Amino acid sequence: MKFDSRVMLNSANNNSPQHPVSAPSDINMNGYNRKLPQKRGYEMPKYSDPKKKMCKERIPQPKNTVAMLNELRHGLIYKLESQTGPVHAPLFTISVEVDGQKYLGQGRSKKVARIEAAATALRSFIQFKDGAVLSPLKPAGNLDFTSDEHLENGIENLSSSKMFEIIQTMLTEKLSNPTSLEQPTFCMSQNVSKSAITVDGQKKVPDKGPVMLLYELFNDVNFECINIDGAQNNCRFKMTVTINEKKFDGTGPSKKTAKNAAAKAALASLCNISYSPMVVPQKNVPLPIDDKSSSMELPQIHADTIGRLVLEKFMEVIKGQEAYSRRKVLAGIVMTENMNFCEAKVISVSTGTKCVSGEHMSVNGAVLNDSHAEIVSRRCLLKYLYAQLDLQCNQATAYQSIFVRNTDGQYPYKLKSGVHFHLYINTAPCGDARIFSPHENDTGVDKHPNRKARGQLRTKIESGEGTIPVKSSDGIQTWDGVLQGQRLLTMSCSDKIARWNIVGIQGSLLSSIIEPVYLHSIVLGSLLHPEHMYRAVCGRIEKSIQGLPPPYHLNKPRLALVTSAEPRNQAKAPNFGINWTIGDTELEVVNSLTGRTIGGQVSRITKQAFFVKYGFLMANLPGILVRKVTTDYGQTKANVKDYQIAKLELFSAFKREDLGSWLKKPIEQDEFGLAE
């Protein structure tokens, strides 16, 4: 029997006691016909059984140390021992008694202190393989459990027998360090997101900014702007962050940039967290040839140390001659022994961006053809290598040299084991390493790796900046052609660094005395693009290089970018450059256009100067079998057969890759003799 709502309405209006009406059970008190979900002819998802919803299978979450301890020991009581510190930052101490022994834990909240007390108790009767961390109280974020990478985020369905190993790999350093309880402000906060560091030890770029991450990791973080240099339109800010009385500096064109740089330096030093573009695995950036288990990245703290040492040395040597402090490119070479950066030495410092003018070419090797900073720094290193071989000429000083006798090798001398050289440049070297847009796909994979512009040999332009492909040049350079007005072209710095990674940085003359010396790392102050930089310095010929005589090989230096990147300098490049080598009493200022010092003298790092030093070594160095030196400089270089073979194989590799032909200076430049 159907019920008509009009009956109820009529009866309500009549208020007649003779017509009592009782509403059915499926009608609410407002008079609307709303059937229960069970009586409807169809089902709606939102009316699903609530009991079934509660029974939905859940993914098991990791247990913290309190839960672990409660499973192993029942009836434990946690007591609040004390509360110290200010109101806004209290420090709680909680104890738990297990098997008659009391264990303490401290934290910024009672919950954290209880977890630490439980962890201390667990460590007393469970033997761990290594020291380790607490498992997180909650997942770091929304996780994709279908992904193979979900284990890195700390969520894993493990049995209780394996949970102890998880505790070991996830405890904070504070628990493994007894003194940490005395210094709670230096310990990491307990709500740190684990997404910045993976469980397997491999680093990836954090998904948070350095300042935010630093505040999450440490409780006591203080930033301070301590210095502002430069004019209003080109100022430089210096920020310092203090963490547990340790200071870390950062510089930048704005306070925000400087603050980020300081935070990056602190994270790299204290947590080994790097924001370097080299952290992200690149498609075309394979591992170094000498270490297949490591990445192409130099540790960030080492890169920052190298950059800081070079900058400090530059400021030191320029004192008193501030007029020559103007520069666009700064370079330097740092030497380490056994990778001990605490005792690293700055071998050379240089500035410069120009090449010699064609009218100032020298037939006596008395001018510097290329005054670009990185090229000059390498020539300063040559000066240092000659000085170190000089020490071998005297038995009383031989032990001070970085070289040792190579009794069982084909070369009389070799570097001591563990000696490494690191090149710093404040920007990417000119040429192939700098042919990219820094704001387009900054660190992504190159979408056009086969584009014709990629990897091309390029030349510097006389009396100018920038480079052009060698295919656009006039080919062979002649002395009379240059004097008549043809531009004198010099190979780009990217190409020369690629050459050093085949034949070494010791030059052709020293190659008859010592084994090849290679750069261990290259650190840039700005404009580091992993793929472009790797391709420029070694990647473009790695598939085509062949036939190198041992011990010559393709060297793959580690790459890094400093945290305090240098801003783009729009000022006009000066026509001079400076150079300094360890042991020099003062710096040398060279006019880049003439290739001579500003006083018109011959520079101390010219071909002529090195040929004289080479002649002295050949006459006095112990262990030299053939001491006769050809009076012609070019012929002496040609007599170093293995070096020449390696160099020709390099040129052939570029040709096989269709990257152009290596452009040489007029041959007359090397046709000079050894001074009597």
UniProtKB/Swiss-Prot annotation:
Positions of the A to I editase domain: 348-672
Transmembrane segments: none
GO CC field: cytoplasm; nucleolus; nucleus
Entry-linked SMART domains: ADEAMc, DSRM
Tissue: Expressed in embryonic nervous system; late stage 13 sees ventral nerve cord expression which spreads to brain by stage 16. Expression is maintained through to adulthood.
Binding site for Zn(2+): 372, 430, 493
UniProt keyword list: Hydrolase, Metal-binding, mRNA processing, Repeat, Zinc
Matches recorded under SUPFAM superfamilies: dsRNA-binding domain-like (SSF54768)
InterPro entries, A to Z: A_deamin, dsRBD_dom
Domain DRBM: 61-127, 197-272
GO molecular function, one term: metal ion binding
Polar residues bias locations: 8-31
Name of the protein described by the UniProt record: Double-stranded RNA-specific editase Adar
Gene: Adar
